[in-house]
Amino acid sequence: MAKLVVVIQCDIVQKKCVGYACMKSFYERSGRFNGYDADTRYLTVTCGGCCGAGVAGKIEDLNRKLKRWGDDRKDVVIHLASCVVSDNYHRPPCPHRDYIKEIIERKGYPVI
């Protein structure tokens, strides 16, 4: 089971959204966060801006931090936030969501 859940938020939406609903869902273990252990940690980062290519650099930074702190990357799972994948009150789904998912998967992480 994952020990760290990383949530990728839309860079544009993040400028006006604090991510409270995502955080609340995580701590209540509702929706896509159902089933995570109580000691699972939570981290949010943005995609880096359109077209999402910046997420590659952010994942490389995450890899360096995991190594430095002795954490195993196999304990990390990445979620795409609702502002990226769904049509909601912020905006329509990100047109680059499949590209972002592909980058994350190429870096060896599961994407939810």
Residue ranges and their predicted role:
Residues 1-68, 89-96, 102, 106-110:
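Conserved mixed alpha/beta catalytic, RNA-binding, or beta-rich assembly cores of soluble enzyme
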Residues 4-6, 76-79:
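Structural motif
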Residues 70-72:
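Acidic (Asp/Glu)-rich catalytic clusters
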Residues 79-83, 88-89:
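Active-site nucleophile-His-acid catalytic modules used for acyl/amide transfer and hydrolysis
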